[in-house]
Regions:
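Glycine-rich phosphate/pyrophosphate-binding beta-alpha loops
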Residues: 45-76, 154-156
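Alpha-helix N-cap/helix-start motif at coil-to-helix transitions, marked by capping-box chemistry
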Residues: 7-18, 56, 77, 92, ...
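C-terminal charged capping/lid subdomain of soluble metabolic enzymes
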Residues: 108-178
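Alpha-helical scaffold segments in soluble metabolic enzymes
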Residues: 15-26, 39-42, 46, 61-68, ...
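Carboxylate- and glycine-rich phosphate/diphosphate-binding segment that chelates Mg2+/Mn2+
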Residues: 1-54, 161
Length: 178
């Protein structure tokens, strides 16, 4: 999704997304499913290639700000909790890329298809009910989280196709809060 995405990065990303959509729920719900675990591991490896080749988006900057203030918050849990609001805000900047991701997830090739697929994946893995409040995150610090996201990892915002502002980050956090 970053502006420095490349065909090679896209190739690995789309394959990783396909494997995650298909195999992650199986691996989460049955740890003995070695086929599912192998494909999740491969998807994880491909994702590492993508971060090296094409970087990542400011969603990671926002989450790192959250976990900096709340060290018990796992990075993945933070990403999950902000994912829907983040991608809803980001998607208008590159709907065709989201359509490709949705198709890789086996969903309708559209932004809505992606958002629906994201929700289905979260539900299938039992992480759709994560709450920011359970990790000590409170709305009174949303402005501080936004400032921290920009001051510590602002380079990712510069690589975004969607030019988010600190106010946009606060809005994403507000929509994600429970």
């Amino acid at each position: 999704m970053a502006t420095i995405a490349s065909p090679m990065g896209d190739m690995f990303a789309l394959q990783a997304i396909e494997y995650i959509a298909k195999y992650l729920p199986r691996a989460v719900n049955n740890g003995d499913d070695l086929e599912a675990r192998a494909y999740v591991a491969l998807a994880n490896t491909y994702s590492g290639f993508v971060e090296t080749i094409s970087c990542c988006t400011s969603e990671h900057s926002i989450e790192h700000a959250l976990s900096a203030f709340h060290p018990s918050l796992p990075h993945g849990a933070g990403l999950i909790m902000i994912s829907w609001a983040y991608h809803e805000a980001y998607a208008p900047s590159c709907p065709e890329r989201y359509a490709r991701v949705a198709a890789a997830m086996g969903q309708e090739a559209s932004v809505d298809g992606f958002l629906n697929g994201l929700n289905k994946l979260k539900e299938a893995c039992g992480v759709d009910k994560l709450k920011m409040s359970e990790f000590g995150i409170t709305p009174d610090l949303f402005d501080e989280y936004a400032k921290t996201a920009f001051s510590t990892m602002g380079n990712l915002f510069e690589l975004d196709r969607c030019k988010l502002t600190p106010a946009d980050v606060v809005s994403i956090l507000e929509k994600s809060y429970s």
